[in-house]
Swiss-Prot record:
UniProt organism field: Brucella anthropi (strain ATCC 49188 / DSM 6882 / CCUG 24695 / JCM 21032 / LMG 3331 / NBRC 15819 / NCTC 12168 / Alc 37) (Ochrobactrum anthropi)
Similarity comment: Belongs to the purine/pyrimidine phosphoribosyltransferase family. XGPT subfamily.
Top class in the EC scheme: transferase
Principal location: membrane
Pathway it works in: Purine metabolism; GMP biosynthesis via salvage pathway; GMP from guanine: step 1/1; Purine metabolism; XMP biosynthesis via salvage pathway; XMP from xanthine: step 1/1
Function, as annotated: Purine salvage pathway enzyme that catalyzes the transfer of the ribosyl-5-phosphate group from 5-phospho-alpha-D-ribose 1-diphosphate (PRPP) to the N9 position of the 6-oxopurines guanine and xanthine to form the corresponding ribonucleotides GMP (guanosine 5'-monophosphate) and XMP (xanthosine 5'-monophosphate), with the release of PPi. To a lesser extent, also acts on hypoxanthine.
Gene: gpt
GO terms of molecular function: guanine phosphoribosyltransferase activity; hypoxanthine phosphoribosyltransferase activity; magnesium ion binding; xanthine phosphoribosyltransferase activity
Name listed for the protein in its UniProt record: Xanthine-guanine phosphoribosyltransferase
Compartmental location: Cell inner membrane
């Protein structure tokens, strides 16, 4: 299995700063948010940070699995939906949080459930970006984001390869 050539490694510190920046942007909208729905699993960490920063106590999850081999996305399956009370009024006043929108397939499924919710991700790729209301950083579609919860400390090859000099 070969992963994409373009890598975007994100440290815990950087992710925390970016998630706080996401909360800052949402706070600037001056709306009355009453709940957050985290898209699991990637949305759990940014949702915790956004909840803290915005003072939101009601946190829900929606669990959607995409079975894949880290090079291609498979079929989407809803493992756990959103509670009925948060689905009322199309999700108005609810922030849906995820770490990343890639193809937009996951966001499309949740947006179908909650068309009036506000969708926020820390990172966005071009294909998924139209489905997201607020994000912090856009990366190219062919970039692989390495999140801190997926990494350990290992040696990294130089970008230029094995050029001596």
């Amino acid at each position: 299995m070969s992963l994409p050539d373009k890598a975007f490694p994100v440290s815990w510190d950087q992710f925390h700063r970016d998630a706080r920046a996401l909360a800052w942007r949402i706070a600037g909208m001056n709306r009355d948010w009453h709940a957050i729905v985290a898209i699991t699993r990637g949305g759990l960490v940014p949702a915790a940070i956004v909840c803290r920063e915005l003072g939101i106590r009601l946190i829900e999850t929606v669990c959607i699995a995409s079975y894949h081999d880290y090079t291609s996305q498979g079929d989407m399956q809803i493992l756990k939906g959103v509670s009925e009370t948060l689905l009322e009024n199309g999700g108005e006043g609810v922030i849906v949080v995820d770490d990343l929108t890639d193809t937009g397939k996951t966001a499309a499924i949740v947006r179908e459930m909650m068309p009036k919710a506000h969708f926020a991700t820390v990172y966005a790729k071009p294909k998924g970006r139209p489905l997201i209301d607020t994000f912090v950083t856009e990366v190219s579609q062919d970039t692989w984001i390495y999140f801190p919860w997926d990494m350990g400390f290992t040696y990294q090859e130089p970008i230029a390869g094995d050029k001596r000099g």
